[in-house]
Amino acid sequence: MSDHVTRRLRIHGRVQGVWYRESMRLKADALGVSGWVRNRMDGTVEALVQGPFEAVDTLTAWARRGPEDAEVTAVDIAEESAPPMGRFEKRPTA
C-alpha cells in the first residue's frame, strides 16, 4: 500500500449547512477514496481520507473549494497512518 495515503483534514469557513459532507462523500465515492467526514461542534468539518495518492490529492484540492455554497477559509492537513478503511461515510457531529 505504499502508493496509498491517509490524511486528516480540518476544513474552516462557512462549511456547515451547505451540503459539504454529502458533496464530499459523493466526490470521494467517484474517486474511490475511503474514509469519513463529520461536522465538528466548533463549526468546522473534519475528514479522514484514504486511498491512492493521486485520488486523495484530488479530494484534498476539492476540499479547499468545497461545494458551491461553501466558503472555505483554510484546510488543515495532517498525514496519518490508519488501517484500511471501507467505503466513505458521513458520521455524526463530534
Predicted segment positions?
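Intrinsically disordered, low-complexity, mixed-charge
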Residues: 1-94
